């Protein structure tokens, strides 16, 4: 049953990732990897929020921890695509884009996790 919860969350996370990515790229274009950037930063926020709330509610079924952080957020975010896009920008001589993407992803990712934890703590308070 554990695998089913991960798979269910993962399927929904993958669909959300695809939908959000397409929506962003259709509006902002592909000069910068806006879709992956937005997905990873919002995923960082969601992991901070979800784990803070789930940790405060240990009485919830373990299925929630499998379905949301492991399944949904795990499939929604994409470290490998982030790394690939950073390397491809550098290989194409777009060092400014590569450095900006790398640095802003890390900085805003950490900030988003923290913000998610702050919001999560307010929810459970």
Curated annotation (Swiss-Prot):
**TM helices/strands, residue ranges:** 4-24, 34-54, 99-119
Q: Please list the residues that bind Na(+).
A: 74, 77
Q: Which GO terms describe its cellular component?
A: plasma membrane
Q: Where's it found, cell-wise? A: Cell inner membrane
Catalysed reaction, written as an equation: fluoride(in) = fluoride(out)
| Keywords annotated in UniProt | Cell inner membrane, Cell membrane, Ion channel, Ion transport, Membrane, Metal-binding, Sodium, Transmembrane, Transmembrane helix, Transport
Q: Name one GO biological process term.
A: cellular detoxification of fluoride
Determine the domain of life of the protein's source: Bacteria
The GO terms describing molecular function are: fluoride channel activity; metal ion binding
- What controls its activity? Na(+) is not transported, but it plays an essential structural role and its presence is essential for fluoride channel function.
As given in the record, the signal peptide range reads: none
Give the family, as the similarity comment puts it.
Belongs to the fluoride channel Fluc/FEX (TC 1.A.43) family.
Q: What does this protein do?
A: Fluoride-specific ion channel. Important for reducing fluoride concentration in the cell, thus reducing its toxicity.
| Name the record gives this protein | Fluoride-specific ion channel FluC
Which species does this protein come from? Acidobacterium capsulatum (strain ATCC 51196 / DSM 11244 / BCRC 80197 / JCM 7670 / NBRC 15755 / NCIMB 13165 / 161)
